[in-house]
Amino acid sequence: MKRRSVLAALGGPLFPAATDGPLPNVTFNKADAKRVPDPSGELLIYFDGPTDMCKRMTAGSLRLKPGATPHPPHEHPEEEFMVVTEGAGEMFCDGKTVKVAPGAMMYCAGRKLHGIVNTGKVPLTFYFYKWRV
C-alpha cells in the first residue's frame, strides 16, 4: 500500500494531543507514533497535519524488510527528505540511483520520481519528512 493511500485512510491530523490548530511544540517518542499495517515493513506515522508554517506536514519512519520497497518510484506534489538510520539500500531521485547506508539523506523536490529499496540482508530504517506550504 502506498504511503499516500495509508495517510488518506488515516483521516485527520495525527499527534498525541488533539488540538484544533497547528501542531503544538511537542516531542514524539516511538510509542506515540501511529503503527500502520504495511507489507514492506513497520510503518510509523509520527505526525500528519498542519504546522505553524505548513498546510500539511507528514513525518514518519519505515523499517523495510530485506529486499523490500514500499512502492515503485513515485511522485507527489510535496518536497521530501528521507534519512537512513539502519541498513543498506538504494535511493532513487530524479533519474539518479545512489547506494545508501546509515547517515545518508536524500532531498527530492516535488513532482520528481523517487523511491527507496532495501538491498541488504537486515532491515533498512529510514525517516521521511514531506510538507506542503
Q: Which ranges hold each PLM region?
A:
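Cofactor-binding loop segments of dinucleotide-utilizing enzymes, especially the Rossmann-like FAD-
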Residues: 86, 94, 129-131
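Ligand-binding loop in jelly-roll beta-barrel domains
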Residues: 54, 110-133
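Exposed loop/turn and edge beta-strand positions of beta-sandwich/beta-sheet ligand-binding modules
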Residues: 58, 77-78, 110
